[in-house]
Amino acid sequence: MDQHKVKTPVEVVETYLDILYNQRRLDLIPDLIADPTWRHAPGKISQLTRQESIQRLTELLELCPVLRFETAVRVVEGAMVTVAWNGWSTQTSGKSYEMSGIEIFRVVDGKIVEIWNSREAAGLWQPSKTF
C-alpha cells in the first residue's frame, strides 16, 4: 500500500478524534491539521498557526488527564465531515464531565483546514430509536 496516499476526509477526522485525542497523540498534529487552520465559533472566527493548534491541544490535554470522544453520528459530503460526538473528561481538579457536541470539519489534501463548533453541552447523545 502506498504510504504517501492522502487520507480521505473521514479518515482524517476519525484519526483526529479517535487517535490524536483518545490516545493523546499530539505528534500527529502536523499530519492532520493544516497551517493555518480556521476555527469558527458563534460570532467568532480565529486563524491558528500549527504551533497555536499544538499549544491549544497540549493545554487541553494537560487540563484533562482523562479525555475521550466517541462519534455518535457522522455525516459526510465531499470535503465536509460533520460529527455529533459524546465526550468524557476528568480535569486535574478531579471534576468529571459527560458532554456532547457537534463539529463540522473541512478537510483538503488530507488536512483539516476549518472547524466549526459551538460550546459542548452537558449530557450524552442517545442512540436513535427510529432507524
Q: Where are the predicted features?
A:
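Short, low-complexity N-terminal intrinsically disordered segments enriched in polar/charged residues
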Residues: 1-35, 129-131
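A solvent-exposed, acidic/Ser-Thr-rich amphipathic alpha-helical stretch
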Residues: 26-79
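Short, cysteine-centered beta-strand-loop-beta hairpins and adjacent loop/turn segments enriched
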Residues: 62-63, 89-96
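Short, surface-exposed coil-to-beta transition loops
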Residues: 68-69, 84, 97-102
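A short hydrophobic beta-strand element
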Residues: 77-87
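Residue-level structural signal for beta-strand termini and adjacent loop
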Residues: 87, 102, 118-120
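A short, surface-exposed beta-strand/turn
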Residues: 100-110
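Low-complexity, intrinsically disordered terminal/linker segments enriched in charged
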Residues: 114-131
